[in-house]
Amino acid sequence: MSDPHRGAYTPPTDAPLSFDARQPVRGARPLPMTLIISAVVLVTLVVAVVMIYRDGVRGPNDAPQAVGTEVAQMKTPPAESSQPKDPASGLQIYHNEEPQPSATFAAPPETPLARPVAPTATTPVETASLPAAKPAAPAPTIESLATAAAAQKPAPKPVQVAQAAPKPVAAAPATTATAPKPAAVSTGPASVQIGALSSPALADKAWAEAVRLAPGLAAGKGKKVETVDKNGTTLYRTSVTGFATREAAKAFCEAIAASGKSCFVK
């Protein structure tokens, strides 16, 4: 520990010179002015807050303060003219048009045609006319009997004239019915696929039904059935062929699609 009686200019000794914080300072300790000022300021703020709070908030037994002026009691409803009017009322911004039904492209009903009847071969029938009946002989008289007695002389034999035998009438050749020629099948490049069926019978049925739905557009068109193996299952892809243009095939597809059938143009 340092010697308190050593001065600043005292020559050093063998004793170590060190600072001891526990060594008392000479004279009286100064007052903590900063702490005192902080306490005074804090007390002042607390007093100010308490006074402001008590002045702005009513007591527990005080009635609430009235805000604004009192409203008189309304005995009758206000007139419509006194109510504010919306300047945009009555304006029609959008047109309330009734929705029009969309056009449905359905095939017209098919007109049944008369089945062609083959003409039957008729053989001409020969008719023979009966000979004319001989007139009845008049009653004999005396003069006629005398004339007959005088005429009972052998008359000369008549000369027999050979008459030509009538030629047999040749029978008219029987007319045979000619089968109607099948309508020519169009061979256009475009086609419409109408489905992939599980059997040839269903494929033929689907083709016939598609042609029936649009007979005018499918007139003279062909049928094409392709065998396709898909995932171990054999399908029969059916198409209506022979359309001259892609537009004609598209029109046929739209006509049968309007009846609920699926198709696409190839």
From Swiss-Prot:
Entry keyword annotation includes Cell membrane: yes
Recorded topology in the membrane: Single-pass membrane protein
Alphabetized UniProt keyword annotations: Cell cycle, Cell division, Cell inner membrane, Cell membrane, Membrane, Transmembrane, Transmembrane helix
Compositional bias annotation for Low complexity: 112-136
Subcellular location per the Swiss-Prot or TrEMBL entry: Cell inner membrane
Swiss-Prot/TrEMBL GO biological process terms: cell division
Membrane spanning stretches: 33-53
Residue span of region Disordered: 1-21, 71-136
GO cellular component term, pick one: plasma membrane
Side of membrane Cytoplasmic, spans: 1-32
Chief subcellular location: membrane
Alphabetized Pfam families for the sequence: SPOR
Occurrences of domain SPOR (ranges): 184-266
One GO MF term attached to the UniProt entry: peptidoglycan binding
Periplasmic topological intervals: 54-266
Entry annotated with the keyword Transmembrane: yes
UniProt comment concerning the protein's domains: The SPOR domain is dispensable for cell division, but it consolidates the position of FtsN at the cell division site and the cell pole.
Subunit architecture: Interacts with FtsI, FtsW and the cell division inhibitor SidA.
UniProt function note: Essential cell division protein.
The protein's name: Cell division protein FtsN
Gene designation: ftsN
